[in-house]
């Protein structure tokens, strides 16, 4: 006997019970250890930060990380999965700052670095219990007891070793360059961090500013004669910018050498801009006083909008860093560059070398002046009228100042894409300063070549989003002017300036006169800042630089750092024993600029090879309306809300099947509820149906019931089952759980809506003949196989089916479905022709029901005829062979198959068409057909009464009735049919005995009273 199945199963409670079963039996551990002799399969877990609560997007990534290793284990692989925690960096620091009420780095310095970092250390596992609970609740099997932790000394030391390898190859350098800078956090950011913080539709100024040309430079440029104009009218160059705060640092204007420029007569003055931009700026109607090429403008000089020296800001020469004297005339040049666009602006680009990457490059190339009037907190310095203000606040003041001086041509607003800090959400500024860089551009070709060895899902990511990122790769600004992170392992001599990178603690201890290390090792600031030694070159004091590492460097180093490579002897075999490279990683698509990139870059820089082979890139989660989830929109769904209501399997199944992995997917309680109803409950109802009838008949599973002549319906479902095994195996092997899951959905639909429905009478009949036993065994085989196919997807439901269907029948079986092998298809049982024929019958039946629905004809009402037009004549034989099934499904008396292309007349027919297929039902109803339809309606009402009266499925009853003349004649005419369908021993006209369950009914305007009793 199987355990009785509750048709109204509480899935969340069932899952809690199964979690306990797994824990009691140590199933996860056994699933790994039992496969120790198998080939290794390695998952790299992208480490989350546990100082914040897990969200629904974490559930998405974790269930996709889970499904493939579960499948691989069932295929015989040894697949230990080690978790990880990202414990450094801005995500941690900002939370602690918030707790302490800090608003700047100065607050941290006053508080004390040691105390601040101690708070960071204690905060990183603030929500670890919630992470662990969620991980267990969704059945994400990963070893968190032995998780790697990026703040551990051993992990940090491996990160140092990795950087030393790059240093020794000449790939690490310090440079004064423009880098993305967060004024709130007071630190540089890498390009991949910046890529994660862009916001669309950001509103900013759009100002067009006039720069007055120094007239004496016209003669030098040879334009004085070419452009003859009244000497009393000034001549301006018109430039455009969205960052007015950078205008005080302007030291050049850039033009395109090959493009045409026009001088417009603006009545009171002349103004120069690119000719192709006149129409867009609505200046085409202004008189043109002259034209020239951009190259002709090179050599002109103009007056600065602001003379920085008047406001206490030095002006330096980028060629030699010398300072421009106060008495020296200050004029700035017009230069030609390749980056001037004719698609926006004026064709004249405002250039401020201190605040733009291309601007800085131009400054170096042309030896421009350099003005730095903004501090690291993003505030204007000097004695400007707008000094002390944050740059974005100063925009208005600067624009107002220029307007008052007659230098503002237009002052508008625009919406565009702008970068914000990925952690604190402050607007970034581009800022020239010293930073440490990894020369990733030196290995650009290797990065691109290695990417071609990686299998990306979806495939377009390889040469699209990720490939483009690699093609446009820039050097990695890896240093951060912060506190809680892996210290940059570079020491500089305070005397001679020599620098060197240290690759490990023992190497450091071996340095001459090394001192400062505490008894308890802690490789963090401020302790590591005290570690000094003597310079090999001059004997001076070697002191560590103050920066810490980008936390993306930490997570990107995990392939080696998690094993303390190469310091632990057993770590040196990672490439031989299958721990490197990873077989599989999975995260959201934005990690193409984050973890996916840092992993690939570090591995290429050190080993010149990729460190992962297969990657599933996940799209983002949206709300039910397709909008991004955010607290401000109040549309964030907490995982517990859905898990407590529908269970983890429902959420997992929705994520796998709702959309391909790379697509954005909508998410809501309602959508998960639909999955529960459409798939899990359908499967559960089949399972419940089987157990109910198998227990009634005391069925014991045995393969012998499927030997010899197997009924066609059973042969078909077993054929479909074995084809399903092939398809799911292929899908998961190809890292496509969506396609695999959808095939399972299709099969469960076939099983429920066709096989079980068409086999019901086989289960209902009283005798246990070969046909009935074959049906039981076929359905049992399907359910048991499904439990194993579903194990990687919906581990709880799979376990429930296995525990009840397998272990109850064979106590010696493996104690969990997750310890079993993945099903292997018996290809000898696959009958493609039979599958196609029955699928055609299902298609015709579905279209026929649609045609009936159009004519408002109930399914219980028999019809005279159905006419079918097929796509090809070759399909006719199979359909006619199975004609009886079509007649039964559509409740019609006759089937006619027409020639392909036949047009069925509309009169007296209702039709449904799909492509070349048409199914039409005859809508005319004879008295005999109407009577038969009424009899079927009476059966339906009696079946409902049986349930309401509390009878079991197999109970026989006695039925009494009172009816009008028409219904009485129908009942007498179809009495045998009614008795058989309702398990009525007798069908008696007249009132029933006392205590019988009674109902008074109206059937198409006719009155009927029914009583049912034992």
Swiss-Prot record:
It is found in: Cytoplasm. ATP binds at residue 631. IleRS has two distinct active sites: one for aminoacylation and one for editing. The misactivated valine is translocated from the active site to the editing site, which sterically excludes the correctly activated isoleucine. The single editing site contains two valyl binding pockets, one specific for each substrate (Val-AMP or Val-tRNA(Ile)). It comes from the Bacteria. Its cofactor is Zn(2+). Pfam families: Anticodon_1, DUF5915, tRNA-synt_1. PANTHER family: ISOLEUCINE--TRNA LIGASE, CYTOPLASMIC (PTHR42780:SF1), SOLEUCYL-TRNA SYNTHETASE (PTHR42780). This is Isoleucine--tRNA ligase. Its EC number is 6.1.1.5. Monomer. A motif ('KMSKS' region) lies at residues 628-632. GO terms for cellular component: cytoplasm. Keywords: Aminoacyl-tRNA synthetase, ATP-binding, Cytoplasm, Ligase, Metal-binding, Nucleotide-binding, Protein biosynthesis, Zinc. One of its GO terms (biological process) is isoleucyl-tRNA aminoacylation. It catalyses: tRNA(Ile) + L-isoleucine + ATP = L-isoleucyl-tRNA(Ile) + AMP + diphosphate. Belongs to the class-I aminoacyl-tRNA synthetase family. IleS type 2 subfamily. Catalyzes the attachment of isoleucine to tRNA(Ile). As IleRS can inadvertently accommodate and process structurally similar amino acids such as valine, to avoid such errors it has two additional distinct tRNA(Ile)-dependent editing activities. One activity is designated as 'pretransfer' editing and involves the hydrolysis of activated Val-AMP. The other activity is designated 'posttransfer' editing and involves deacylation of mischarged Val-tRNA(Ile).
